[in-house]
A protein has these predicted regions:
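Polytopic transmembrane helical bundles with strong interfacial aromatic enrichment
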Residues: 2-159
Length: 159
């Protein structure tokens, strides 16, 4: 089982080591993002038509604006972390981690872009659906990356 994975570390140090803690950090951010998103869904009434130019005036007029902004900023942090993981895995030179990291980044983008479209596009249910699909795929690909990199680290330490 582990024998086929030895090519990860053959001839060079294992550069995927920072991916493991970053993957755990990203997973914790995704869980926190889910909790904030559920709070917004259940307890905050977002005005039906929000234009980007009107957003700053909403900070005074509606109670949940701070939560919405925090949710958006956390989403941007998640996107930056997943982009960093993609760059690290690319420079690692190991194709499977690069493919998983790319899938993770694209799923984060799917969720984030549809979140923005949901907020600024009249709260269309299809955007909410694709936002949730992006979130679920992000969790799946992040866990796959964590497991894959962890197996590679175990091989490196057992050599």
């Amino acid at each position: 089982m582990v024998k086929g994975m030895t090519h990860v570390t053959k001839g060079r140090s294992f550069l995927g080591a920072p991916l493991f803690p970053l993957g755990l950090f990203e997973l914790s951010l995704l869980v926190f993002q889910f909790l904030i998103g559920m709070y917004l869904n259940l307890f905050v009434n977002i005005p039906a038509a929000i234009s980007f130019s009107r957003m700053m005036s909403l900070s005074v007029s509606y109670d949940g604006f701070g939560f919405v902004m925090f949710h958006m900023m956390l989403g941007m942090l998640i996107a930056f972390v997943s982009l960093g993981m993609l760059v690290m895995s690319f420079f690692n030179g190991h194709s499977p981690t690069t493919v998983i990291s790319l899938a993770l980044f694209l799923s984060v983008l799917l969720g984030g872009i549809n979140g923005l479209l949901f907020l600024f596009g009249g709260q269309n249910n299809i955007n909410s659906y694709f936002m949730s699909i992006g979130f679920i795929l992000s969790i799946i690909f992040d866990m796959l990356l964590i497991m894959f990199v962890n197996v590679g680290q175990d091989i490196h330490h057992n050599r």
